[in-house]
Curated annotation (Swiss-Prot):
Name of the protein: Aspartate aminotransferase, mitochondrial
Main location: mitochondrion
Reactions listed under catalytic activity: L-aspartate + 2-oxoglutarate = oxaloacetate + L-glutamate; L-kynurenine + 2-oxoglutarate = kynurenate + L-glutamate + H2O
Class of this enzyme: transferase
UniProt keyword annotation of Lipid metabolism present: no
EC annotation from Swiss-Prot or TrEMBL: 2.6.1.1, 2.6.1.7
Note in the entry: In eukaryotes there are cytoplasmic, mitochondrial and chloroplastic isozymes.
N6-(pyridoxal phosphate)lysine PTM sites in chain numbering: 279
PANTHER family: ASPARTATE AMINOTRANSFERASE, ASPARTATE AMINOTRANSFERASE, MITOCHONDRIAL
Encoding gene, per UniProt annotation: GOT2
Length: 430
């Protein structure tokens, strides 16, 4: 009994003499997370789960953001297989990468984005760090803004934008605003609305721009429109934050897809840039990306680099090794790079071809609607203009799965199912 009177009674002994204490202790131990609510399912992953449960042999999954070949199968680029074989033959170690990543990968990524003859590269007034794909690049950039962009907390996103943009910037401590971008009447770019809204954005705010193949709409500004946007950005002294997840994958030409980024820099606008190799190299699960900041001079770039490393260290310490080695091998080996560029163009051309076939099949079905926006849009995704109730019918009656906003992944369309898709769309829109 001495233990009970010492004021330091063992919990088990005290509980034996006081059943109420046992119940209270049990309640305390089991109720840490009773306040945690069930979160909503991811809308795109939810589409995939519903697709998997469907037993219809004609079912189509047009929600997934990954390339598929014309048989509807995942595609590993032959250049990636070659790079993997070359790397394996070297019997390399698995040591940690530096905080900023694989140096030869970072250098090659900057060259791919900005152009090999870029003044920025020659002067050294930039920093590139390897990131955990495009999402990681965005988060590193957002966290850097939160810590060092002293002018504003507002980030202006196009309406609509990739669904992950909002939580990435919000969770980093930034505030989200919007500007007009997509015109549902034309299923095209609302150029007038975009320029009007950007012209009214408070000076020294952050403007997020999709460099090419806008997700989710597939609607991109034309070069002359980009020029006017750049003029407004420069006049309003806005910070241009580019997300470039589809270089080469949009048009089949990497230089063409990077045109907007390069034009802004040529106009004296110091941008930051997020890159991903998920789509254009098919390295989805390898998580290969880069974040680049264009600075005033080389000294500023070194200071920014030091702070980016300080941000990265407590997040994940070092980026993954394998995917960066693959990408670096492809970008830095002339024959592999040439092969890769041809393969990227092949993927882009297949998607462009599927757009054309879909419109052709809709006409064959007798549709009198104007479907030109399907071929006008670019990249993996197409904003069909379908209404939520029409999407619901496609899912229930035809087992064609997509997100409620009518966005489809054209990469999921093949020459064997494009006719079925056109028939179904015609049935719900006639």
């Amino acid at each position: 009994m001495a233990l009970l009177h010492s004021g330091r009674a063992l919990p088990g002994i005290a509980a034996a003499f006081h059943p109420g204490l046992a119940a209270a202790a049990s309640a305390r131990a089991s109720s840490w997370w009773t306040h945690v609510e069930m979160g909503p399912p991811d809308p795109i992953l939810g589409v995939t789960e519903a697709f998997k449960r469907d037993t219809n042999s004609k079912k189509m999954n047009l929600g997934v953001g990954a390339y598929r070949d014309d048989n509807g199968k995942p595609y590993v680029l032959p250049s990636v297989r070659k790079a993997e074989a070359q790397i394996a033959a070297k019997n390399l170690d698995k040591e940690y990468l530096p905080i900023g990543g694989l140096a030869e990968f970072c250098k090659a990524s900057a060259e791919l984005a900005l152009g090999e003859n870029s003044e920025v590269l020659k002067s050294g007034r930039f920093v590139t760090v390897q990131t955990i794909s495009g999402t990681g690049a965005l988060r590193i950039g957002a966290s850097f803004l939160q810590r060092f962009f002293k002018f504003s907390r507002d980030v202006f996103l196009p309406k609509p934008s990739w669904g992950n943009h909002t939580p990435i910037f919000r969770d980093a401590g930034m505030q989200l605003q919007g500007y007009r971008y997509y015109d549902p009447k034309t299923c095209g770019f609302d150029f007038t609305g975009a320029v009007e809204d950007i012209s009214k954005i408070p000076e020294q705010s952050v403007l997020l721009l999709h460099a090419c193949a806008h997700n989710p709409t597939g609607v991109d500004p034309r070069p002359e429109q980009w020029k006017e946007i750049a003029t407004v950005v420069k006049k309003r002294n806005l910070f241009a934050f580019f997300d470039m997840a589809y270089q080469g994958f949009a048009s089949g030409d990497g230089d063409k897809d990077a045109w907007a980024v390069r034009h802004f820099i040529e106009q004296g606008i110091n941008v930051c840039l997020c890159q991903s190799y998920a789509k254009n190299m098919g390295l989805y699960g390898e998580r290969v990306g880069a974040f680049t900041m264009v600075c005033k001079d080389a000294d500023e770039a070194k200071r920014v680099e030091s702070q980016l490393k300080i941000l990265i260290r407590p997040m994940y310490s070092n980026p993954p090794l394998n995917g960066a080695r693959i990408a670096a091998a492809i970008l830095n080996t002339p024959d592999l790079r040439k092969q890769w560029l041809q393969e990227v163009k092949g993927m882009a051309d297949r998607i462009i071809g599927m757009r054309t076939q879909l419109v052709s099949n809709l006409k064959k079905e007798g549709s009198t609607h104007n479907w030109q926006h399907i071929t006008d849009q670019i990249g993996m995704f197409c904003f069909t203009g379908l209404k939520p109730e029409q999407v619901e019918r496609l899912i229930k009656e035809f087992s064609i799965y997509m997100t409620k906003d009518g966005r489809i992944s054209v990469a999921g369309v093949t020459s064997s199912n494009v006719g079925y898709l056109a028939h179904a769309i015609h049935q719900v829109t006639k």
